UniProtKB/Swiss-Prot annotation:
It comes from the Bacteria. One of its GO terms (cellular component) is cytoplasm. This is 1-(5-phosphoribosyl)-5-[(5-phosphoribosylamino)methylideneamino] imidazole-4-carboxamide isomerase 2. Pathway: Amino-acid biosynthesis; L-histidine biosynthesis; L-histidine from 5-phospho-alpha-D-ribose 1-diphosphate: step 4/9. The keyword Transcription regulation does not apply. Its main location: cytoplasm. Keywords: Amino-acid biosynthesis, Cytoplasm, Histidine biosynthesis, Isomerase. One of its GO terms (biological process) is L-histidine biosynthetic process. Its EC number is 5.3.1.16. The active site is at D8 (proton acceptor), D129 (proton donor).
Length: 240
């Protein structure tokens, strides 16, 4: 399994939100590129980036810090937030991004996801953000009636590289991930699943690893910044 350290960008800073609420922000680093370099120096092989402002605006907002991270860090990075058309997808991939994460558009314009996955094999992931089993969009501000598993299964034959599954009520809360829902999703689809939201201890990582090969990785943010998870130990758990 791969550990994806999260760098969530708001107003040019690396932050964490509680339950996806933009009014409940903790700033962890004024220099996101420096934070990214710390993660890489510690042995991380991927970076998970989120343009929080972009997720609400529907277009890239924190492009400058993302581009700086891509310039300075020599490991692949995936980015979500505000990527809702082919031009934006192409622009980010041209700038060296390894993978784009399509969330809102996966609900509102699934054909774009399929088109992008065909055009850029291995470079398109679907972000499924859930609250009480239902998909939320537009920076988690809007809830839909779409079931998580139904949305995931609709992309079975689309060629997407991964599904990033986030339980919103666990995100930033340090209460552990939703293991049951994550495992159920991973076992319901053939697409690799990456778990996000609530990873707060080495025990959580052990629990996710026990879900089996269907789970490709885990994203952690606040626990790494707070020191609740030792990064070296976390990497060892997931590689072991």
């Amino acid at each position: 399994m791969i550990l994806y350290p999260a760098i969530d960008l708001k107003d040019g800073q690396a932050v964490r939100l509680l339950h996806g609420d933009m009014d409940k922000t903790t700033v962890f680093n004024d220099n996101p590129a420096a934070q990214a370099l710390e993660f890489v120096a510690a042995g991380c092989e991927w970076l998970h980036l989120v343009d929080l402002n972009g997720a609400f605006a529907g277009e890239p907002v924190n492009a400058a810090p993302v581009e700086e991270i891509l310039r300075q860090c020599k490991v692949p990075a995936q980015l979500g937030g505000g990527i809702r058309d082919m031009a934006t997808i192409e622009r980010w991939l041209d700038k060296g991004l390894a993978r784009v994460i399509l969330g809102t558009v996966a609900v509102e314009n699934p054909d774009l996801v399929r088109e992008a996955a065909r055009a850029f094999p291995g470079k398109v992931a679907v972000g499924i953000d859930a609250r009480n089993g239902k998909v939320a969009t537009k920076g988690w501000a809007e809830e839909t009636d779409v079931e998580v598993t139904d949305l995931a299964k609709s992309f079975e034959d689309a060629g997407v590289a991964a599904i990033i599954y986030t339980d919103i009520m666990r995100d930033g809360a340090m209460k552990g991930p939703n293991i049951d829902a994550t495992a159920a999703l991973a076992n319901a689809v053939s697409i690799p699943v990456i778990a996000s939201g609530g990873v707060s201890s080495l025990e959580d990582l052990h629990a996710l690893k026990s879900c089996g090969a269907a789970l490709n990785g885990a994203i952690s943010g606040r626990a790494l910044y707070d020191g609740a998870i030792d990064l070296a130990e976390a990497l060892a758990v997931l590689k072991g």
